């Protein structure tokens, strides 16, 4: 089980990222617009830098929904490989069966 503080920190990053997503997109589209003058684009870069770091979507960590484990998380299920193997072994994941040949 992961530390509760790291799970909470990741949740707050998700919330900040969602709330400032549109503002970041608008600033980035203006920054990459070649029709705007260089000085104005530089001021837009500075305003983007003033936004909180945790509002960036790249700072969000993919974590297991059950344990909070940060590594080995499958995108399809949102569960770490260990828990996924355990649940599949018990037959609790619909549509997935353990293969044998």
Swiss-Prot record:
UniProt key word Transcription regulation: no
Region Disordered: start-end pairs: 1-22
Gene3D superfamilies linked to this entry: 1.10.287.1480
A molecular function (GO) term: structural constituent of ribosome
Classification via InterPro entries: Ribosomal_uS14, Ribosomal_uS14_bac/plastid, Ribosomal_uS14_CS
Extent of Basic residues compositional bias: 11-22
Pfam families: Ribosomal_S14
Biological processes annotated in GO: translation
Entry's Gene Ontology cellular component terms: cytoplasm; small ribosomal subunit
Keywords recorded for this protein, A-Z: Ribonucleoprotein, Ribosomal protein, RNA-binding, rRNA-binding
Function according to Swiss-Prot or TrEMBL: Binds 16S rRNA, required for the assembly of 30S particles and may also be responsible for determining the conformation of the 16S rRNA at the A site.
PANTHER family tied to this protein: 30S RIBOSOMAL PROTEIN S14 (PTHR19836), SMALL RIBOSOMAL SUBUNIT PROTEIN US14M (PTHR19836:SF19)
Family designation: Belongs to the universal ribosomal protein uS14 family.
Oligomer and partners: Part of the 30S ribosomal subunit. Contacts proteins S3 and S10.
The protein's name: Small ribosomal subunit protein uS14
Species in which this protein is naturally found: Rickettsia massiliae (strain Mtu5)
Taxonomic lineage from the root: Bacteria, Pseudomonadati, Pseudomonadota, Alphaproteobacteria, Rickettsiales
